[in-house]
Amino acid sequence: MLMILLFQRLGIIMILAFLLVNNSYFRQLIEERSKREKLVLIIIFGIFVIISNMTGIEITSDKSLVERPILTTISHSDSLANTRTLVITTASLVGGPLVGTVVGFIGGVHRFFQGNFSGAFYIVSSALVGYISGRLGDQLKTNNLYPSTSQVIVISIIAESIQMLFVGFFTGWDLVKLIFIPMMLLNSLGSTLFLAILKTYLSNERQLRAVQTRDVLDLTQQTLPYLRQGLSQQSATKVCNIIKQHTNFDAVGLTDRTNVLAHIGVGQDHHIAGQAVKTDLSKSVILNGQPQIALDKTAIACPDQSCLLNSAIVVPLKINNETVGALKMYFSGDKKMTEVEENLALGLAQIFSGQLAIGIAEEQNKLANIAEIKALQSQINPHFFFNAINTISALIRLDANKARYALMQLSTFFRTSLQGGQDREISLEQEKAHVDAYMNLEKLRFPDKYQLDYHITVSTKMTLPPFGLQVLVENAVRHAFKERKKDNHICISITDQGEFYKVAVSDNGQGISPNMIDKLGQETVSESKGTGTALVNLNNRLNLLYGSASQLHFDSTDQGTTVWYEIPYQKGDKDEHFNS
């Protein structure tokens, strides 16, 4: 009889658990485990543990079972069979020792007051169960995954055994004989079911992210040749066809700021290339530069009453933070836009914006000085690009979040590279973002191999040549450390020297050979890992911009190398400063 009643209570807890795990906010909480997330988990499981106490089975002093819907109080001589230990164990496995201990303490305190100030030992036993379960769970985790089913069962048995030891010592072993087997089975089964549900959801989510990232990469590779041609009707039609073939959208469109460039799928009979943008939704996105989602025809606001498009996401395409068009994805019929489609559209728009920037830069390059542009373009090392792509491809299978992060870093790197190719000078902030993107990608390839530090005490308005830091940092990464696997430090220093800024990049590498150092920055060299063209190009641009006094200097010993140059002050340089 007790077993049946307890399993009824288990059903209540499992229903609540299913509703909880089905919530994306809760799944985010358990993956991050910051202080704020732990506090929220304590609140959630604290409520659960109180519910467990209040839905328990009352056992009188003569071992009779009393079933009441809600147990607000019980006699000090009575006991409870409940799911409290199950909730505490689950909280510990999900949130760790701290969450488990606090939830156990909450459950024990509530049980103490529920029993008319009897059973103080429950406070200690419940907190101890939470701590031990959490510690065991953390130690048994592999690859940031939860313990296996067999391990969860063992932890649950240990947790229930601890609780029963306290019950036996303080209330008598007859009660333990009555409730131990049902409670142990209940706790083991409940914890296993909860973790199984949770792991299934998390696994599906990770697989979905991996698929999304792979889809974005596939679409990026296929659309790159067309978007680099710029936004035209011909290139837009090719891109829309590719997206339509590789997604489940019913229609895909591209616009510039005023006209439809292409519309493939449902509605192409009246969303016609070359005509003005029709829908209020698209006009609003282009005007405000913010993505918008429409969940019905009214929100899309197409003037054609026969239009079958029922939901949409429209995302701006931007170059240098200026909206140049919009990517539009539609569903018809009863299909609705979900978070999956939203993330796909946002990711594509960001990548497409970068591809368009590449196209614009290439067009401008044709009109610029060919020799200088070739030198600038040499900064985007093709080996670095292919290494980054290979890293992202590997991460897709291992860690979708890291793959997405790497993709964004690569996008930042190329965007800042292309902006640098258009300008004679850029801000220190822009150059720093370029360096950070480069190093973040290198750190993904070689975790723990490099450490980059900044010592910057100058104005945020300071300008310097494009690649004025990145070239030197990349030079250190490629040449300074040879095969050394760790303790490789690079420091960027920009300081105020009175009449000029001193820009220096130092490393603790193995130094530069004396017969090589006089050639660097002055002429190309023959070396297995490069020719020094980037250093020559940077040195020439320093001379052109600031005169012969500003050129690369190399100080090197077997303890490391410092490469530095000077930049004269410019008006407004001392208004704002970094804190690095």
From Swiss-Prot:
Modification Phosphohistidine, positions: 383
Keywords: ATP-binding, Cell membrane, Kinase, Membrane, Nucleotide-binding, Phosphoprotein, Transferase, Transmembrane, Transmembrane helix, Two-component regulatory system
SUPFAM superfamilies reported for this sequence: ATPase domain of HSP90 chaperone/DNA topoisomerase II/histidine kinase, GAF domain-like
Keyword Transferase: yes
GO molecular function: ATP binding; phosphorelay sensor kinase activity
Keyword Ribosomal protein belongs to the record: no
GO biological process: cell wall organization
Domain Histidine kinase residues, every copy: 356-571
Its membrane topology: Multi-pass membrane protein
Name of the protein in its database record: Sensor protein LytS
Organism field: Streptococcus mutans serotype c (strain ATCC 700610 / UA159)
Taxon lineage: Bacteria, Bacillati, Bacillota, Bacilli, Lactobacillales
Gene name tied to this protein: lytS
